[in-house]
């Protein structure tokens, strides 16, 4: 075997080995590229899913916020309507006059008088009811008209001796009735 043949065999072997290495390298490069493309696709898919989740979450939050805002607006509107109705009722009560006002005031004083037993008692009422109260109080022993109080009408009756104070004003009766019937009033107003 000549030296040229040996050199040629070594070259052929080196070329074959180089081709094999190149082929393996190309295969490996293709595998790496395929893997990188799969990973890139996975990253893009995950980013799209995350973006959709965020969009959905933001939409849900905005929708929830809008619903809450609408509910608060409805509640505020209802509260305003209830306040208007309450104010109208107060105005109607304040406008009660004549025999009806006297009968109501007398009835409220009768109920309050049961709490006092022979004590010296002061009866307070609306300043415009002073004459009315003087006439009614004259029928009760030991009762006298006291200073006016800020109310729609009715009476506040008190005695220093027993430290009892009874608030039978139109205002207090209205508030009791209003609180007891608020649910029904609301249901009737808003057809619930």
Curated annotation (Swiss-Prot):
Q: How does it sit in the membrane?
A: Peripheral membrane protein
Gene Ontology molecular function, alphabetical: ATP binding; proton-transporting ATP synthase activity, rotational mechanism; proton-transporting ATPase activity, rotational mechanism
Which cell locations does it reside in?
Answer: Cell membrane
What are the UniProt keywords, alphabetically? ATP synthesis, Cell membrane, Hydrogen ion transport, Ion transport, Membrane, Transport
The protein's matches in SUPFAM superfamilies, at most eight in alphabetical order, are given as: V-type ATPase subunit E-like
What biological process terms from GO does the record include?
proton motive force-driven plasma membrane ATP synthesis
Pfam entry (one): vATP-synt_E
Query: Domain of life here?
Result: Archaea
A GO-annotated cellular component: proton-transporting two-sector ATPase complex, catalytic domain
- What spans are recorded as compositionally biased (Basic and acidic residues)? 8-26, 50-66
Residue stretches of biased makeup (Acidic residues): 27-49
Which residues lie within the region annotated Disordered? 1-66
Listed InterPro entries = ATPase_E_C, ATPase_V1_Esu
Concerning its family, UniProt says: Belongs to the V-ATPase E subunit family.
- HAMAP family the record matches: ATP_synth_E_arch
Q: What does the record note on quaternary structure?
A: Has multiple subunits with at least A(3), B(3), C, D, E, F, H, I and proteolipid K(x).
Q: What does this protein do?
A: Component of the A-type ATP synthase that produces ATP from ADP in the presence of a proton gradient across the membrane.
Q: What is this protein called?
A: A-type ATP synthase subunit E
Instruction: Specify the species.
Output: Natronomonas pharaonis (strain ATCC 35678 / DSM 2160 / CIP 103997 / JCM 8858 / NBRC 14720 / NCIMB 2260 / Gabara) (Halobacterium pharaonis)
């Amino acid at each position: 075997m000549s030296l040229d043949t040996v050199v040629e065999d070594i070259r052929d072997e080196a070329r074959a080995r180089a081709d094999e290495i190149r082929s393996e390298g190309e295969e490996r490069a293709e595998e790496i590229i395929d893997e990188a493309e799969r990973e890139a696709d996975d990253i893009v898919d995950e980013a799209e899913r995350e973006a959709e989740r965020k969009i959905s979450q933001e939409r849900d939050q905005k929708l929830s916020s809008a619903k809450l805002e609408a509910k608060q607006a409805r509640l505020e509107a209802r509260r305003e309507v209830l306040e208007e109705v309450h104010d109208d009722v107060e105005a109607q009560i304040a406008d009660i006059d004549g025999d009806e006002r006297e009968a109501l005031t007398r009835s409220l004083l009768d109920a309050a008088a049961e709490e006092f037993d022979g004590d010296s008692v002061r009866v307070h009422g609306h300043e415009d009811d002073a004459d009315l109260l003087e006439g009614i109080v004259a029928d009760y022993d030991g009762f006298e008209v006291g200073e006016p109080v800020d109310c729609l009408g009715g009476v506040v009756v008190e005695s220093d001796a027993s430290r009892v104070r009874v608030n039978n004003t139109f205002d207090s009766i209205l508030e009791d009735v209003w609180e007891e019937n608020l649910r029904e009033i609301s249901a009737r107003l808003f057809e619930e």
